[in-house]
Every structure is written in structure tokens, then in C-alpha cells.
A protein has these predicted regions:
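Conserved RNA-binding domains used in RNP assembly and mRNA/RNA metabolism
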Residues: 3-104
């Protein structure tokens, strides 16, 4: 059995290894989503994130002719494979892109 590499000796990681790792993370995230979706009242999609939340407030704002959206979410869960804790008390999002809010 081979142990870990000696300090200062990097082990090459292939693109396939990275892809398999990210696929495993994505599958784990999907399973977590499936387990928690029933705890929430809303699905919120922005151009950068996907959220579950129990309270959502969307305000349409303008500034210098530009239209943007301010979102406030309470008691939320964030779809993000790189976050160690996906449950958050509150989220504030400002976006110039489309926003989709659906009641579950």
C-alpha cells in the first residue's frame, strides 16, 4: 500500500479526477436539495444562484435609467457546491438580470 506523497512532491491530478470529484459534489448537493425542499415556500432563481426561502421580497428599482432588482430572502438555502453551510438566515441580492420567484 502506498502512502501519501512526501512533502514537496505533488501528485498530478487529471481532468477526469477533477470532473469526477465535481460530479460527486453536485450529486450530493442534489440529494441535499431533495431532502430540504419541502421545508421551504419559495424557489428563487437569479443569474448567479438558486435559492430556497420561506420569505421573499422583490423590489424593482431604477437608477439613471437602469432597472435593477433588490431581493431580500429570509430563512434560505443556497444551491452552491462550494459552501460548507448552505442554510442562511437572510440573503440580500442586487441584480440587473432576470429574477424568477415561484411559490412551492
Amino acid at each position: 500500500m502506498r502512502g501519501p506523497p512526501a512533502p514537496g512532491h505533488d501528485v498530478p491530478v487529471s481532468a477526469e479526477d477533477i470532473e469526477a470529484y465535481e460530479n460527486d459534489l453536485e450529486l450530493d448537493l442534489y440529494r441535499e436539495y431533495r431532502d430540504v425542499v419541502s421545508l421551504f415556500s419559495y424557489v428563487v432563481e437569479t443569474e448567479r444562484r438558486f435559492y430556497l426561502a420561506n420569505a421573499v421580497d422583490v423590489q424593482v428599482r431604477t437608477n439613471g435609467g437602469e432597472v435593477f432588482f433588490e431581493l431580500s430572502l429570509e430563512d434560505a438555502w443556497v444551491w452552491d457546491i462550494y459552501r460548507s453551510s448552505r442554510f442562511v438566515k437572510s440573503v440580500h441580492v442586487v441584480t440587473f438580470k432576470d429574477v424568477n420567484v415561484e411559490e412551492l
